[in-house]
Amino acid sequence: MSSSYDEASLAPEETTDSFWEVGNYKRTVKRIDDGHRLCNDLMNCVQERAKIEKAYGQQLTDWAKRWRQLIEKGPQYGSLERAWGAIMTEADKVSELHQEVKNNLLNEDLEKVKNWQKDAYHKQIMGGFKETKEAEDGFRKAQKPWAKKMKELEAAKKAYHLACKEEKLAMTREMNSKTEQSVTPEQQKKLQDKVDKCKQDVQKTQEKYEKVLEDVGKTTPQYMENMEQVFEQCQQFEEKRLVFLKEVLLDIKRHLNLAENSSYIHVYRELEQAIRGADAQEDLRWFRSTSGPGMPMNWPQFEEWNPDLPHTTTKKEKQPKKAEGVALTNATGAVESTSQAGDRGSVSSYDRGQPYATEWSDDESGNPFGGSETNGGANPFEDDSKGVRVRALYDYDGQEQDELSFKAGDELTKLGEEDEQGWCRGRLDSGQLGLYPANYVEAI
């Protein structure tokens, strides 16, 4: 028996990572604490997504508000203006849906996890969770008898291995003494007695080692059964968590997936209908009747001189006022066409930004920058030393001598309020004074 002994067996036995090793149940216990932390992680995850949904919804709202104003003030008109505006309506409605997503995530999903976590994990006064302590105590109790046997086994194995080592050393010394002349017979006998004693120690320690190993083998089935029972209890607890969180994730998916939301689908169905409702021919007819050859015209006629009427008219007096329904000679059809276009709802921002026709008059009284006698003896802009700074939204080329010209982004000074015809007085940074369409600028 001793002759087969190998010194390599004296090296400490490598411990395995098996669940059955003493103390390796702690990973299963730790999983309970991890489950509580994972609930917190999921709630934080949902809360961050809710913030994103809220921010995105607000961005859509701000974007829609800004562009709706720009479209209303811009030159686009007619049914295409309404179709373009439908994009802004879509943004407002989608913003509301994303706010609903945010509310569902916080009020339903997050609260659901929070309540389940509170019911599943019970904190102790001394710290930790009741469920963790129960699992720890269960495993420790199940492993205690087997761990005690394993300790005895380790001691018996160590004693046996040490005896084998002593035996081998004694045999080596005894063999070497036979070749040495200096060793006396008495010394030779002592070395032989040492070998015999070591062999007896090896026999005793081996028998004890085998007996303890046999006892461990007898207790192993009961040990495995007890450990398995506690482990299954932990598995059942973990199964509840896994199933619950899967349900929550499906709820989150349902709330996030707007593609399956009937309201979301309806938004884009309405948007498509609004865009397809744009009619180029209708818009062209409307423009023809309001700003083209279809407009009414007070064609020149012979007029008798009337001493009771002023000889000149101002710029505003020369403009036809559609809203007042003025009947003009030879323009009945055009007026009716204009009225019909209005009935169809083709009210456009273009009306508000349309430059007015050039007067057919050489009289200087029609020019606000003309002689002092015609304009009450003073330039109407000279008293406006102060004003409001504005920025041009679009390019505008003055059509008349008294109109300003500027490019989009240019800044100028507004010197008066908008008149009933949609014009404002202003001053360029160069010092030039004149009129400009009020809806072509925005306050800075």
Curated annotation (Swiss-Prot):
Highly expressed in brain and, at much lower levels, in heart and pancreas. Residues 13-283 form the F-BAR domain. One of its GO terms (molecular function) is identical protein binding. Residues 175-194, 309-386 are annotated as: Disordered. One of its GO terms (cellular component) is endosome. Residues 26-275 form a coiled coil. Pfam families: FCH (PF00611), SH3_9 (PF14604). Its main location: cytoplasm. The modification Phosphotyrosine is found at residue 394. Keywords: Cell membrane, Cell projection, Coiled coil, Cytoplasm, Cytoplasmic vesicle, Endocytosis, Lipid-binding, Membrane, Phosphoprotein, SH3 domain, Synapse, Synaptosome. Signal peptide: none annotated. It is a peripheral membrane protein. SUPFAM superfamilies: BAR/IMD domain-like, SH3-domain. One of its GO terms (biological process) is plasma membrane tubulation. InterPro entries: AH/BAR_dom_sf, F_BAR, FCH_dom, PACSIN1/PACSIN2_SH3, PACSIN1_F-BAR, SH3-like_dom_sf, SH3_domain. Residues 314-324 have a biased composition (Basic and acidic residues). May form heterooligomers with other PACSINs. Interacts with MAPT. Interacts with TRPV4. Interacts (via SH3 domain) with SYNJ1 and WASL. Interacts with DNM2 and DNM3. Interacts with both COBL and DBNL. Identified in a complex composed of COBL, PACSIN1 and WASL. Interacts with EHD1 and EHD3. Homodimer. Interacts (via SH3 domain) with DNM1; the interaction is reduced by DNM1 phosphorylation. Plays a role in the reorganization of the microtubule cytoskeleton via its interaction with MAPT; this decreases microtubule stability and inhibits MAPT-induced microtubule polymerization. Plays a role in cellular transport processes by recruiting DNM1, DNM2 and DNM3 to membranes. Plays a role in the reorganization of the actin cytoskeleton and in neuron morphogenesis via its interaction with COBL and WASL, and by recruiting COBL to the cell cortex. Plays a role in the regulation of neurite formation, neurite branching and the regulation of neurite length. The F-BAR domain forms a coiled coil and mediates membrane-binding and membrane tubulation. In the autoinhibited conformation, interaction with the SH3 domain inhibits membrane tubulation mediated by the F-BAR domain. DNM1 binding abolishes autoinhibition. This is Protein kinase C and casein kinase substrate in neurons protein 1.
